[in-house]
């Protein structure tokens, strides 16, 4: 059967709407499904061009953490400006920062409605280094399509997902269907912690004013289980130094008479979490909000096998705060972890010493409503309060960020939910993630608006690793989902 071209789909839509114009429910059904045919037809007709434009970005090694790629960062920013203008942006420019530049673009809808929403699309054009190169099965800077997946650095994170946003925008603008104002802000330092972003947001707060922020830089639960990320955990991180004697001592001459810094450190850290998995820092849970029952019910719908989870990481059982499931504990509840610990002699053979110093790096994953600076100070105070005599303890905060939760009853979330349902054929689950993206809380604190995380990654995509890839079927469905998001948000379904 010959594939319906775009003009043919438009004609079919007009004919069917004419036939069913007297039946509102039938009209809605026809409108919805013909619109889906039209966007998928457009994607198919322009697929080769889309892939080549995507490839033109991937071929630029925009590795933000390596000074040797400084010129590549600028080249990538310029290429994004070109692509945004070609897609229909009325303005696109490179804006400097203390680090790598930002790309800013905008589109103002031509409509008589003064109350149309303004969407700010955020992405990043920098990528992680590709090393170790010998583990790649193809050139990381030259896209290679194998078995329905595109392999390259940035295939997913985040050049591939950014292209989803831009191609959905292109379709709507080219066909007179974009009834939202749209602004784009692409940064070049996300992979190094976005050191310039907060300053940029504050300096250009008026320029970036919007009603909602849209980000595609997260993942779905699975290809058959679409989901919207509705929450991220915050982070607090410290280094602890414990100092005892002025030098490493002979454990036979001094053991039992002088406090061992490593013993002291492990004693203190062992007190931070009790046998029920509760964190014992005074006041730690004061700002922790309960998980809404509606969300707990949604979490139960997520396909999850405790046995398979344990087998995948080769442990006998899970552990955590009593009264919560594993999925609740690693996404909606705070946690404490010792990330590294060292001191004394760790070389070959044995050396009987009582070490003079001990160190640990520790972190807390926080949840929305917890302030990372407040928690950071509370932890430092607690450690000092339980420090034993005979050692000196220093707690140094490293970095941190706020958690984030997106309400699932706001219009923008409902629009995203609709987009996923149309594109993937089923209602997406609302799913919090255990990781942290500090920039999301920066958006809320500085710009005063919520963020919708419409991510289309999969665990299999191996972001940050050799052989990063993107499922092309999911990628195309992502374009459909974002297209439908805009239509739903502007009320033009």
Question: What are these model-derived regions, one by one?
Answer:
Residues 3-4, 14, 33:
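Cationic, low-complexity basic patches in intrinsically disordered or flexible, solvent-exposed regions
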Residues 35-133, 357, 361, 374:
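N-terminal helical capping/dimerization or prosegment-like subdomains
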Residues 114-186, 477:
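Active-site metal-coordination/substrate-binding segment of hydrolases
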Residues 125-127, 185-194, 216-220, 244-246, ...:
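Acidic, glycine-rich active-site loops and adjacent beta-strand->loop/helix elements
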Residues 150, 156-231, 490-493:
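Acidic/histidine-rich catalytic neighborhood of metal-dependent amide-processing enzymes
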Residues 222-223, 280-357, 365-381, 386, ...:
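An extended, acidic, His-containing surface patch that forms the Zn2+-binding/catalytic region
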Residues 255-276:
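A short core secondary-structure module
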């Amino acid at each position: 059967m010959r594939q319906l071209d775009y003009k043919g789909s438009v004609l079919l839509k007009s004919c069917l709407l004419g036939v069913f114009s007297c039946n509102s429910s039938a009209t809605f059904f026809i409108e919805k499904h013909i619109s889906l045919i039209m966007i998928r037809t457009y994607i198919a007709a322009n697929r080769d061009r889309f892939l080549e434009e995507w490839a033109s970005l991937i071929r630029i090694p925009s590795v933000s953490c390596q000074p040797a790629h400084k010129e590549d960062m600028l080249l990538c920013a310029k290429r994004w400006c070109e692509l945004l203008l070609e897609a229909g942006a009325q303005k696109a420019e490179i804006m400097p920062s203390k680090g790598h530049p930002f790309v800013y673009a905008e589109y103002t809808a031509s409509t008589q409605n003064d109350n149309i929403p303004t969407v700010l699309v955020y992405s990043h054009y920098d990528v992680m280094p590709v090393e170790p190169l010998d583990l790649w099965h193809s050139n990381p800077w030259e896209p290679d399509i194998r078995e329905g997946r595109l392999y390259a650095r940035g295939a997913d994170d985040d050049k591939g997902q950014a292209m989803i946003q831009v191609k959905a925008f292109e379709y709507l603008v080219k066909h007179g269907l974009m009834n939202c104002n749209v602004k784009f802000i692409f940064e070049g330092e996300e992979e190094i912690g976005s050191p310039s972003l907060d300053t940029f947001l504050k300096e250009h707060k008026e320029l970036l004013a919007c009603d909602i922020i849209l980000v595609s830089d997260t993942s779905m639960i699975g290809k058959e289980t679409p989901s919207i990320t509705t929450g991220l955990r915050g982070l607090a991180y410290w280094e602890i130094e414990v100092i005892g004697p002025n030098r490493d001592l002979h454990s036979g001459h001094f053991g039992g008479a002088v406090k061992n810094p490593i013993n002291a450190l492990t004693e203190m850290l062992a007190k931070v979490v009790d046998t029920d998995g509760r964190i014992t820092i005074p006041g730690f849970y004061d700002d922790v909000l309960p998980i809404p029952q509606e969300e707990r019910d949604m979490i139960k719908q997520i396909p999850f096998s405790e046995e398979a989870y344990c087998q995948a990481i080769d442990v006998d059982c899970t552990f955590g705060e009593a009264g919560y499931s594993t999925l609740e504990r690693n996404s909606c509840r705070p946690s404490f972890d010792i990330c590294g610990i060292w001191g004394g002699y760790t070389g070959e053979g044995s050396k009987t010493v009582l070490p003079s110093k001990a160190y640990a790096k520790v972190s807390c994953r926080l949840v929305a409503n917890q302030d990372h600076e407040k928690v950071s100070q509370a932890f430092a105070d607690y450690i000092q309060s339980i420090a034993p005599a005979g050692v000196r303890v220093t707690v140094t905060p490293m970095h941190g960020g706020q958690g984030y939760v997106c309400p699932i009853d706001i219009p923008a979330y409902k629009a995203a939910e609709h987009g996923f349902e149309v594109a993937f054929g089923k209602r997406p689950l609302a799913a919090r993630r255990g990781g942290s993206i500090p920039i999301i809380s920066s958006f809320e604190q500085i710009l005063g608006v919520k963020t919708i995380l419409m991510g289309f990654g999969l665990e299999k995509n191996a972001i940050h690793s050799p052989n990063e890839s993107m499922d092309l079927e999911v990628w195309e469905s992502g374009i459909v989902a974002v297209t439908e998001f805009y239509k739903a948000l502007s009320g033009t379904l």
